[in-house]
Structure formats: C-alpha cells, structure tokens
A protein has these predicted regions:
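Conserved, mostly hydrophobic/aromatic
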Residues: 8, 39, 47, 92, ...
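Glycine-rich, proline-tolerant flexible connector loops at the mouths of alpha/beta enzymes
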Residues: 46-62, 104, 165-175
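Charged helix-capping and loop-helix junction motifs
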Residues: 60-67, 141-150, 175-183
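Catalytic cores of alpha/beta
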Residues: 73, 77-96, 180-215
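Glycine-rich phosphate-binding active-site loops on the catalytic face of alpha/beta enzymes
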Residues: 94-112, 197-201, 213-229
C-alpha cells in the first residue's frame, strides 16, 4: 500500500481543515517545499496536494507551488482542487505532475472525465467525497442525492483507474477512517482505492493495508505526531 503524505494549500501556505470547513484552517508548517523535502527524508515516494483556494474559486490558484514540488523534489505529485477544464489537466500533465484528481466535475460534468481518461489514461484519478454515503461537491459545500458507490461504478465504466475516497465527517478529525465504506467500495469496483480522512495512527494504516487498499492519505496525523510517517511507510513496503 502507498502512503500519501498530504499538503493542503491556502494562500500558498500548508494548512489543514477540520471536516472540510474552511473557517477551521490552521497553518501546519512554515512552507511547502521544506515540508515536501521532509516527506522525502521519511521515505515517501508520493505526495497528495490540494489547491483549496482552487476548490472554492473553481480554477487553478496555487498551481505554481504544486509544480515546484514536482520539479524540486523526487516526489510523485497527485493534485486535486480547482481542476474544471481540459486545459487545467494539460497544464499539470505538462509540468511534471503524476496524477490529476477530478472531483466535483465527476458528478457535474462526467463527459470531461471521459475525455480526460481517453487522452491521459492513468494520469486521471477521481476524488469521491461523501457525507453519510452521499457525494458532496464544490469544496464540500454542496450535497447531492448520488450514492458514492453509484458514482464509483460510473467512473469505473469510463476507465478511471484510481479513486480517492474521502469521508468528510472523518477528515481532519483523527478519529479513524471509515473502513466499512472503504471495504464496500474496494469490493464494488476494480479501481485502485485510496483512503482519505480520519487516518490517525499506525493501527489505521495496518487495517487499511490488510483490507487490500491501494493507498492511504495522511495529513493531520503527520503534523500532530499521532502517526510516524517513517513507520507507516515501512509497514506498507
């Protein structure tokens, strides 16, 4: 299983949110590049980055900082937030980004996902964010009546390789991941499933690993010290 240390960005700074609420944003480190280098030193090969300003503004905002990580470290970068058009995907694909995560557009504009997968293949992943099993969009500010499994199956049928599943009620809470939903999703589709939200300690990592998940995104647990990144990477080798 892959471990994805996370950097969420507002105003060019690394932050974390509680349950996706922008009013709870807390800066968690001094700067992005130094933080990314610390992940490399811990043995990470990937990093999960989110342009939170982009999520709200529905356009790329912090893309320069994200591209800098791809070009100034050895990390493979996956990026989500504010990606609404093919030109956004083009930009990241041509600037060293290894995976582009389509979120809100998966529900609102599935034709874009289809076109993107056709052109970029496994570079494209889909982020499914859910509250009580139903998909939320636009930086989690809008709900829907679409069940997360239904959206996942639709994405699978379009050829999407990787799905990042976030349980919003767990995100930034350090209360453990929603293992039940993750296992249900992993069994329902053939896509690689990455867990996001609630990962707290090494036991969570081992549980996700033993349930056959592809990856785990770790944010607040690293910054608050409840998870040792070096150990997390070691138990997943």
């Amino acid at each position: 299983m892959l471990i994805f240390p996370a950097i969420d960005i507002i105003d060019g700074k690394p932050v974390r949110l509680y349950k996706g609420d922008f009013a709870t944003a807390q800066q968690v480190a001094d700067d992005i590049i130094t933080t990314a280098h610390s992940f490399v030193d811990a043995g990470a090969t990937w990093i999960h980055m989110v342009d939170l300003d982009g999520s709200l503004k529905k356009e790329r905002v912090n893309h320069r900082a994200i591209v800098d990580v791809a070009n100034q470290t050895s990390l493979k970068v996956e990026i989500g937030g504010g990606i609404r058009k093919m030109e956004d995907i083009d930009f990241y694909a041509n600037n060293g980004i290894s995976r582009v995560i389509l979120g809100s557009v998966a529900l609102k504009n599935p034709a874009l996902v289809k076109e993107a997968v056709k052109e970029f293949g496994s570079l494209i992943a889909v982020g499914i964010d859910a509250k009580n099993g139903f998909v939320a969009t636009e930086g989690w500010t809008e709900g829907s009546d679409t069940h997360f499994i239904d959206l996942a199956k639709q994405m699978e049928s379009m050829g999407v390789d990787t799905i990042i599943y976030t349980d919003i009620s767990k995100d930034g809470t350090l209360s453990g991941p929603n293992v039940e939903h993750l296992v249900e999703l992993n069994n329902a589709v053939s896509c690689n499933i990455t867990a996001s939200g609630g990962v707290t300690n090494i036991n969570d990592i081992i549980t996700l690993r033993d349930n056959g998940l592809y990856g785990a995104i770790c944010g607040k647990s690293i910054y608050q010290g409840t998870l040792d990144l070096v150990k997390a990477i070691e138990v997943c080798r």
